[in-house]
A protein has these predicted regions:
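Short amphipathic alpha-helix that is part of the acyltransferase structural core
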Residues: 2-58, 180-215, 244
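Catalytic cores of nucleotide-enabled group-transfer and carboxylate-activating enzymes in metabolic
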Residues: 23-24, 35, 46-61, 65-78, ...
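Conserved long hydrophobic alpha-helices within structured protein cores
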Residues: 47-48, 81, 108-126, 236, ...
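Acyl-donor-binding surface of acyltransferase catalytic domains
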Residues: 1-13, 87-183
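Active-site donor-binding loop signature of nucleotide-sugar glycosyltransferases
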Residues: 26, 87, 171, 189-192, ...
Length: 255
């Protein structure tokens, strides 16, 4: 049965023999999250993070309520996995999109934790939709790399199908070709007083793209506080006088 807590509707916790589950409690859980993520640092498509990064990310979170939308898995009282449901309004489909993230300790992958957690993520998303957005369109969504074949099999068996494919591409920095700019366009850095203009131009440029959303103010605050991605000294901004004509927001992951 679902339960009510602090005006939230809570889906029942996952159940899996040999493991215990609980919801997120407080920032004291952040270090466990870092340890779980970093156990996979040598895997393909790895994520690199730190306690500072996690703290900054969760300081401005709005797409989730951690106490409602996050669950940890434990074995022998040790945290070995966590997951979080999130939601955003998607203009292009006129729907609430319920996505999720999940990190499982490298040593505990393939033990059934992923499937148990995905089931809970879907249940909690349904609770959130019925409580907050009843009557509106809603759908489950997830981005997965092809290297995560087990998770792909799980979601396919649960009725998901691929709607879009993305490619990660890389090249070295040698012999980068030069292309002349159109007349009247100049490239220069953005000043601190123009960071909001850069953000707004970026959001506007993507409104016609597949899966476009309108980010809340908290995402701007998260963006300017995350030094792994917010590195304006590396940006290449094309200006048409005062308006922004285009941009490449370069960054070097410092973690």
């Amino acid at each position: 049965m679902e339960s009510q807590n602090n005006n939230y509707t809570l889906a029942p916790l996952p159940r899996l023999a040999g493991f215990n589950f609980r919801r997120f409690e407080d920032p004291g859980d952040y270090q466990a999250m870092v340890d779980i993520i970093m156990s996979n640092v040598d895997d393909p498509n790895n994520t690199v993070t730190s306690l500072k990064d996690i703290t900054a990310d969760y300081a401005n979170i709005t797409e989730s309520v951690p106490a409602r939308d996050m669950v940890f898995a434990f074995h022998a009282e040790q945290p070995i996995a966590y997951c979080r449901s999130a939601s955003q309004w998607e203009e292009s489909s006129n729907s609430w999109i319920y996505g999720w993230l999940m990190h499982v300790h490298h040593d505990w992958k393939g033990r059934g934790i992923e499937e148990a957690m995905i089931g809970w993520l879907e249940d909690q998303a349904v609770c959130n939709h019925q409580t907050l957005h009843a009557g509106a369109n809603g759908m489950h969504s997830v981005f997965l790399p092809e290297s995560e074949q087990e998770r792909l099999n799980i979601v396919i068996n649960r009725g998901y199908s691929a709607s879009r494919h993305f490619e990660n591409m890389k090249r070295d920095l040698a012999e980068i070709p030069e292309h002349p700019l159109p007349e009247g366009i100049t490239v220069r850095l953005a000043m601190p007083s123009q960071y909001r203009q850069v953000w707004d131009a970026n959001v506007e440029a993507f409104q016609d793209h597949w899966g476009a959303t309108i980010p809340p103010e908290s995402e701007y605050q998260e963006w300017i506080s995350n030094k792994n991605y917010f590195q304006p000294y590396l940006w290449q901004i094309a200006w048409d006088g005062d308006p922004i004509a285009g941009m490449v927001l370069n960054f070097i992951n410092l973690t």
